Amino acid sequence: THYVNMTTGETFRKVGKTDIHIVFENKAAFIGECKIWNGIKKFEEAIEQLFGYSTWKDTKTALIVFNKENKNFASIQQNVFSWIKSNAKRYEVKNGNIWSCVLHREDTNLDVQVAIALYDITI
């Protein structure tokens, strides 16, 4: 499916603005949040922020994290993977920096599909 003219950025959604929002048939087909890596605590906050933007109908979401400063990208990958192993109901490693996860939202008692992607953009 192609989402021509259905994608917006910085879109108001529930509680705040999401970075990437794709609408299909009057529903959110995808909600994405982009962050700069600032440690695992900020990563957890970003997951909660993503959940805050989604409603009970929204099941396809993504957190995209960019590393700008940490020269040891492998340590970031390990931190995130450890968090995923501890918090995801299910997960699949797509490659060393992308995971497909099912996370449980306590507030709605629903499972949400979250793609987590890390990208190293250090110079």
Predicted ranges, named:
Residues 1-26, 40, 106-108:
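Active-site metal-binding core of divalent-cation-utilizing nuclease and nuclease-like domains
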Residues 6-8, 61, 114:
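Hydrophobic anchor at the start of a short beta-strand
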Residues 11-14, 33-34, 64-66:
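Short His-Asn-centered micro-motif
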Residues 20-22, 30-36, 53:
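Conserved catalytic cores of phosphodiester-cleaving nucleases, focusing on short active-site segments
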Residues 22-24, 65-67, 120:
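Residue-level signal for short segments within beta-strands and strand-turn junctions
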Residues 30-32, 62-64, 115-117:
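Hydrophobic/aromatic beta-strand patches that form the interior of the parallel beta-sheet core
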Residues 36-88:
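Catalytic cores of nucleic-acid endonucleases
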Residues 68-123:
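Domain-level recognition of nuclease-like catalytic cores that cleave nucleotide substrates
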